[in-house]
Regions:
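Partner-binding and oligomerization surfaces adjacent to conserved cores of proteins
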Residues: 2-331
Length: 331
C-alpha cells in the first residue's frame, strides 16, 4: 500500500504556496487543504510529552489505535454512497460495493503483515490543532493542566521529511469533517481522475455507463477508486469531532519487505496504555528550532509551572517562549 500511496501523488512535496488563500492543497486532484510554510501548528500534550519532543522525537501512534474507532473508513463509506447514488442497477452496485470493500480490506490487512510475502507496513498519525488556546483541547488532552506547543509548520514538516528515509512517506493536511464537503471532494476527484477521458476503460465514459459496463471495466474502475479512498480516508472524520480543528501528519512506513527489514527502516515499538499494547514509531525531530512557544494549561496556576519550563528550556539552550493560557478558568 505504501507504494500505491507514493506513486499516486509523488509530487506532493513540491506543491507551491498560494498567496491568495490560507490553504494550499496536496495536489491538483487530491483537494485536502494544507497550511502554508509560515503558518503555526499546535500540539497539546503533557510535561512528559514536552520533555520527549524537545529531546528530539515524537511518539507516533498507529492509525488503528487512535481514539476514533472510525479512523481511515469514512472515505470508503462515502464512496459507497456515491456509487449507490449513480448506479440504478442494484446487482451491479452490490458487485461494485463488494469489490471495493474487499480491496480496502486487502490494503489494510497488508498494512499489518502479509504472511505470504512477509511484508509489513503501517500508517502512523500525529494529531495537531489549528487553534492555540482551545477550551475543548485543554479539556480533552490534559484536563486543563497540560501544555500546548506552538510550531512553525514549514520547519516542522521539513525536519520530519529529512528523517523519513526511503521506506516512509509523509502526508499532511487539514482534517475534513463536513459530510457534504467530503462527498463533493471525493466525487469531484473521481470524475476528474477517472471519468474525464475514459481512456482506461472500454465501456465506461461517465457515471451512467456503470450500470451496463463490462465487469472487467467495473473491476478496474473500482481498483482505481480504492486508491482515491485510501488517500481521503487519512483526512476524513465524522462531524462530531469537528471542534478538534485537527491538522494531521500521517507517516506511511514499510517495516519489512519480503521477509527482509529494509535498511534504515523505522521499527515498530509498543507502549502500554490501560493494559493495551499500542504500536507506535519514534519520528525524529532533528531541528527543535521549529518550536516557538509553549502555553501552560489554564488550570495549571502554580507559578512553578512557568518557572520550571523556562528553567528547562534555558538549560537546553532552547529559545522557546513560555506563556499562560488566556482562558480564565478557576476550577
Amino acid at each position: 500500500m505504501h507504494k500505491i500511496y507514493h506513486n499516486s501523488i509523488a509530487a506532493e512535496h513540491k506543491s507551491e504556496e498560494h498567496n491568495m488563500s490560507k490553504y494550499k492543497h496536496i495536489d491538483d486532484f487530491i483537494k485536502i487543504p494544507q497550511l502554508n510554510n509560515k503558518d503555526q501548528l499546535f500540539h497539546y500534550t503533557s510535561a512528559a510529552g514536552i520533555k520527549g519532543i524537545t529531546g528530539g522525537e515524537f511518539w507516533v501512534t498507529e492509525s488503528r489505535f487512535l481514539n476514533d474507532s472510525t479512523e481511515f473508513t469514512i472515505g470508503t463509506d462515502i464512496c459507497i454512497e456515491i456509487l449507490e447514488k449513480h448506479m440504478r442497477n442494484s446487482r451491479r452496485f452490490l458487485y461494485a460495493k463488494d469489490l471495493l470493500m474487499e480491496q480496502m480490506r486487502k490494503y489494510y490487512r497488508e498494512e499489518q503483515e502479509d504472511t505470504v510475502s512477509g511484508s509489513a507496513e503501517g500508517s502512523y498519525v500525529i494529531s495537531f490543532c489549528t487553534s492555540g488556546d482551545s477550551l475543548l483541547m485543554w479539556s480533552e488532552y490534559s484536563d486543563f493542566m497540560g501544555y500546548c506547543m506552538e510550531f512553525k509548520y514549514g520547519k516542522l514538516k521539513e525536519t520530519f521529511q529529512e528523517h523519513c528515509g526511503n521506506d516512509s512517506t509523509l502526508f499532511d493536511g487539514k482534517v475534513i469533517y463536513d459530510h457534504d464537503e467530503q462527498t463533493e471532494l471525493l466525487e469531484d476527484t473521481i470524475e476528474r481522475l477517472l471519468l474525464s477521458d475514459g481512456e482506461d476503460y472500454k465501456t465506461i465514459h461517465g457515471w451512467d455507463d456503470l450500470d451496463s459496463a463490462e465487469e472487467e471495466d467495473v473491476k478496474l474502475f473500482v481498483d482505481h477508486i480504492s486508491v482515491i479512498c485510501l488517500l481521503y480516508n487519512m483526512f476524513f472524520k465524522k462531524e462530531c469531532f469537528a471542534q478538534e480543528q485537527e491538522y494531521r501528519m500521517v507517516f506511511l512506513c514499510v517495516h519489512k519487505r519480503e521477509h527482509q527489514v529494509p535498511e534504515n527502516s523505522i521499527p515498530v515499538e509498543y507502549r502500554i496504555k490501560d493494559e493495551v499494547f499500542i504500536p507506535f514509531i519514534r519520528m525524529k525531530l532533528g531541528d527543535i528550532s521549529c518550536l516557538k512557544f509553549v502555553c501552560v494549561g489554564t488550570k495549571n496556576i502554580s507559578d512553578l509551572a512557568v518557572k520550571g519550563l523556562r528553567h528547562y528550556f534555558g538549560s537546553r539552550n532552547l529559545e522557546v517562549r513560555v506563556k499562560k493560557s488566556e482562558i480564565p478558568l478557576r476550577y
